[in-house]
Amino acid sequence: MRDFINAVQTDGEVDYLIFDCAPGYTCATVAALMSSDDVVIPVTVDGFSFRGLETMARQISGLRRNGLPAKVAGVLITQWRNTDVVAQADALLRQGEIPVFMTPIRRTDKVPESTFERVPLEAYSPRSAAGRDYRMWVEEYLGGELHGV
């Protein structure tokens, strides 16, 4: 993985490389974590995701003790809906130790539709709520990085 990243960096045409790993603690996830500068943890607002977030935080902490260079940039709330349960869970997340990005990604049918079409959401439905949210989140993330946060 590190050789791949070095080759991409040498090429000079890529500013950011994103590894989108499936949930779980696999060899691919560990390799991606060990090769990363930042970790963004996407979380849907439900009990399983909260437990997964706790597990991932413990695993990253363990890897940091073994030389993981990456820092957790924050939690990205996905499939957000305007409900009382989501609002309460959102507030609970924000009380934790892991930073939470201000921009949530709203739930929309366009996201699963784009996966069935095998087309990135940005091309499939750029004006969808989630498409707009992802662009806002990228601005938030890069804005923090560009300002030393």
Locations of the language-model features?
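Hydrophobic residues within well-ordered, non-membrane alpha-helices that form the packing/core
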Residues: 5, 60, 138-141
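Conserved catalytic-core segment of NTP-binding enzymes
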Residues: 7-103, 109
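Short, glycine-rich, amphipathic interfacial segments at transmembrane boundaries or analogous
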Residues: 107-115
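C-terminal boundary of histidine-terminating zinc-finger modules
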Residues: 114-137
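C-terminal alpha-helix
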Residues: 136-148
